[in-house]
Curated annotation (Swiss-Prot):
Keyword terms, alphabetized: ATP-binding, Cytoplasm, DNA synthesis, Kinase, Metal-binding, Nucleotide-binding, Transferase, Zinc
Protein name stated in the entry: Thymidine kinase
Residues the entry annotates as binding ATP: G15, S16, M17, F18, S19, G20, K21, S22, D88, E89, V90, Q91
Originating organism: Oceanobacillus iheyensis (strain DSM 14371 / CIP 107618 / JCM 11309 / KCTC 3954 / HTE831)
Stated family: Belongs to the thymidine kinase family.
Pfam families: TK
Catalysed transformations (reactions): thymidine + ATP = dTMP + ADP + H(+)
Top-level enzyme category: transferase
Length: 207
């Protein structure tokens, strides 16, 4: 364990859906609030699944949040009294959010960010990989695969109960009616391009 001697850093909480990302963000925000630290929390306006003015975890815990359409709005809203900024569902913002997060941390603000590191295809979900590279602290959470009980690092999108095609839009806001966690081996994406390198390497090993 190390001690931060300077104010201003970035903490990323990432993982699949239903892994507890929002719950962990809420927990950290509440601890700061109990300590009378000035906190502001933001969420993308597109995410109105449970409450349009709060972050609500899948288990029902919540904290108030300001819905925004563009991450730049955070810089316009945060004043010199704010000590911590929380941002949920960061994958719904464009890459400008990376610059916003860096600016906040450089100002001496502790920035706590939560989001999906992989999209429903099982591919890196920008801008989270960039934030991961810049963050001082990264917490990666897993859910539980309902098929086998293994740690679930992927998010399975379901359309009428069937796996969504690789060619579907990347962003589709939903909860348990559209998504469930899956492990690597039970994550299904029809029409996903084959990993030719892996296939050739495996074939070479078998021959």
């Amino acid at each position: 364990m190390y001690v931060m001697k300077q104010n201003g850093w970035v903490e990323l909480i990432c993982g699949s859906m239903f892994s507890g990302k929002s719950e962990e963000l809420i927990r950290r925000v509440r601890r700061a609030t109990y300590a009378h630290i000035n906190v502001r929390v933001y969420k993308p306006a597109i995410d109105d699944r449970y409450d349009d003015k709060a972050i609500v975890s899948h288990d029902g815990t919540s904290t108030m949040a300001r819905p925004i359409h563009d991450a730049v709005e955070i810089l316009e809203d945060v004043d010199n009294n704010v000590e911590i900024v929380g941002i949920d569902e960061v994958q719904f913002f464009d890459n400008n959010v990376v610059d916003v997060i860096e600016e906040l941390a450089d100002r001496g603000i502790r920035v706590i960010v939560a989001g999906l590191d992989l999209d429903f295809r099982g591919e890196p979900f920008e801008p989270v990989p960039k934030i991961m590279a810049l963050a001082e602290s990264v917490t990666k959470l897993n859910a539980i695969c309902p098929i086998c009980g293994s740690p679930a690092s992927r998010t399975q999108r379901l359309i009428d109960g069937k796996p969504a095609s690789y060619n579907d839009p990347i962003i589709l806001v939903g909860a348990s009616e559209s998504y469930e966690p899956r492990c690597r081996h039970h994550h299904e994406v029809p029409f996903r391009p084959e990993n030719n390198f892996a296939t050739k390497s495996w074939d070479a090993l078998k021959s």
